[in-house]
UniProtKB/Swiss-Prot annotation:
GO biological process terms on file: translation
Taxonomic lineage of the native organism: Bacteria, Pseudomonadati, Pseudomonadota, Gammaproteobacteria, Pseudomonadales
GO cellular component: cytosol; small ribosomal subunit
Region (Disordered): 1-25
Basic residues compositional bias, start-end: 7-20
Record organism: Pseudomonas fluorescens (strain Pf0-1)
GO MF terms held by the record: small ribosomal subunit rRNA binding; structural constituent of ribosome
Signal sequence bounds: none
Keywords for this protein: Ribonucleoprotein, Ribosomal protein, RNA-binding, rRNA-binding
Name of the encoding gene: rpsT
Family statement drawn from the similarity comment of this UniProt entry: Belongs to the bacterial ribosomal protein bS20 family.
Known function: Binds directly to 16S ribosomal RNA.
Protein name: Small ribosomal subunit protein bS20
NCBIfam families tied to this protein: S20 (TIGR00029)
Magnesium keyword on record: no
Length: 90
């Protein structure tokens, strides 16, 4: 446990950041999940719309350091590949 006042403050700040970052990570997962659901449902238009909404959110969270930039790129690339394949099949 933190003993000095500055250590107590840092612990409090770290906990606050941790909970805030957790909610942002959850939001990213939700946007990704919406795209995946549309892809699984074979709905090309809905998948494209969900992908367009998800990309800026993923990028923003990568810029803020909530997720790693390579992880963001990987998600975008894979989702885009699935959406394009779905549109090509339709």
């Amino acid at each position: 446990m933190a003993n000095s006042p500055s250590a107590k403050k840092r612990a409090k700040q770290a906990e606050k950041r941790r909970s805030h970052n957790a909610s942002l990570r959850s939001m990213v997962r939700t946007y990704i999940k919406n795209v995946v659901k549309a892809i699984d449902a074979k709905d090309a238009e809905k998948a494209q719309a969900a992908y367009v909404l998800a990309v800026p959110v993923i990028d923003r969270m990568a810029d803020k350091g909530i997720i790693h930039k390579n992880k963001a790129a990987r998600h975008k690339s894979r989702l885009n590949g699935h959406v394009k394949a779905l549109k090509a099949a339709a």
